[in-house]
């Protein structure tokens, strides 16, 4: 029987690479040999640290990967052995010490079992798309979906507060639509990355007055503001950056706990607000992969760390202990 290796996290945040048997495929399933799986530091560690509830521990996280189809059941349609695919979910069942492992999305694994007729988020990787870069497709797709939902137009002044991978994805999507882009962060690495990929204005919130900088660019305030930090205390400062009858987007994930902000600011500004969720499904994923392949979305620059699967537990431990302040994006090579 074939075996698989998967990155496992326990409730006390211990990380290990463990081995699991791969059962015989059903007629509608295919087996994918993982090439690369992308790390989502924001969402995955919100789950690992209990900010988001994705079910019980132990858990195999990861929700984006690229690999090659190595076997396909007789009823699989649209895929065959040798195809390269990108995907969001792994349905391989895992047992650990007699207990079921919560695979949540489970793509941090050397193989994936997928029923393409039932699974959301699997598609053929187009020719010319780099596998390593493409394994980080979800975060920019989340940003693209948010920009599409907010209706960003040519000439709009767009602010993103918090330039993690999702926030940067939103900024680049807005820029490709012809918007004037302003990125706000406190991380020197993120600020430099934003400059290198063409963000129009970069604001260091640790040393500059954010409101003054934004008003110098857009005296009446920004047309569209995306709050991407996911930190509730940052909502009020971000709301102040909007113009009258502008648009405000809750781009960050604020977790299970209730949040609050001062009502009279968005009320007085008569803001339109949006709460995007997920990656925009197939249309956004397709667009992101295509733009990566063409070079219009220079996403390889966002990947600062690439590790072998055997090094993944150490990487996750270091991230959990906040030992990698310059980490931008990370990929596991299987």
Question: What residue spans do the PLM features occupy?
Answer:
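NAD(P)H dinucleotide-binding glycine-rich loop of Rossmann-like/cofactor-binding domains
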Residues: 88-161
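C-terminal substrate-binding/catalytic core of Rossmann-like NAD(P)-dependent dehydrogenases/reductases
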Residues: 211, 215, 219, 256-305, ...
């Amino acid at each position: 029987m074939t075996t698989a290796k998967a990155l496992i996290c326990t409730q006390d945040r211990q990380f290990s690479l463990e081995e699991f048997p791969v059962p015989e495929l059903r007629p509608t399933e295919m087996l994918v040999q993982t090439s690369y799986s992308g790390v989502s530091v924001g969402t995955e560690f919100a789950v690992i640290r209990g900010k988001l509830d994705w079910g019980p521990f132990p858990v195999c996280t990861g929700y984006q990967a690229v690999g090659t189809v190595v076997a396909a059941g007789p009823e699989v349609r649209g895929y065959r052995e040798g195809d390269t695919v990108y995907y969001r979910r792994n349905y391989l069942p895992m047992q650990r010490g007699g207990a079921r492992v919560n695979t949540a999305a489970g793509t941090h694994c050397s193989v994936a079992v997928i029923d393409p007729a039932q699974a959301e988020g699997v598609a053929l990787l187009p020719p010319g798309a780099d596998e390593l870069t493409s394994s980080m497709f979800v975060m920019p797709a989340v940003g693209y979906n948010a920009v599409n939902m907010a209706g960003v137009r040519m000439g709009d002044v767009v602010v993103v507060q918090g330039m993690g991978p999702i926030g940067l994805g939103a900024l680049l999507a807005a820029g490709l639509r012809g918007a004037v882009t302003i990125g706000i962060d406190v991380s020197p690495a993120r600020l430099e990355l934003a400059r290198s990929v063409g963000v129009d204005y970069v604001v260091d919130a640790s040393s500059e007055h954010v409101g003054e900088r934004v008003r110098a660019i857009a005296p009446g305030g920004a047309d569209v503001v995306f709050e991407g930090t996911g930190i509730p205390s940052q909502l009020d400062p971000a709301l102040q950056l909007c113009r009258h009858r502008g648009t405000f987007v809750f781009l960050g994930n604020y977790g299970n706990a209730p949040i609050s902000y001062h009502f009279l600011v968005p009320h007085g500004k008569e803001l339109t607000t949006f709460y995007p969720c997920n990656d925009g499904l197939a249309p956004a994923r397709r667009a992101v992969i295509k733009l990566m392949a063409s070079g219009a979305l220079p996403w390889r620059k966002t990947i600062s760390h690439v590790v072998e699967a055997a090094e993944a537990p150490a990487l996750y431990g270091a991230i959990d202990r906040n030992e990698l302040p310059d980490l931008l994006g990370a990929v596991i090579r299987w």
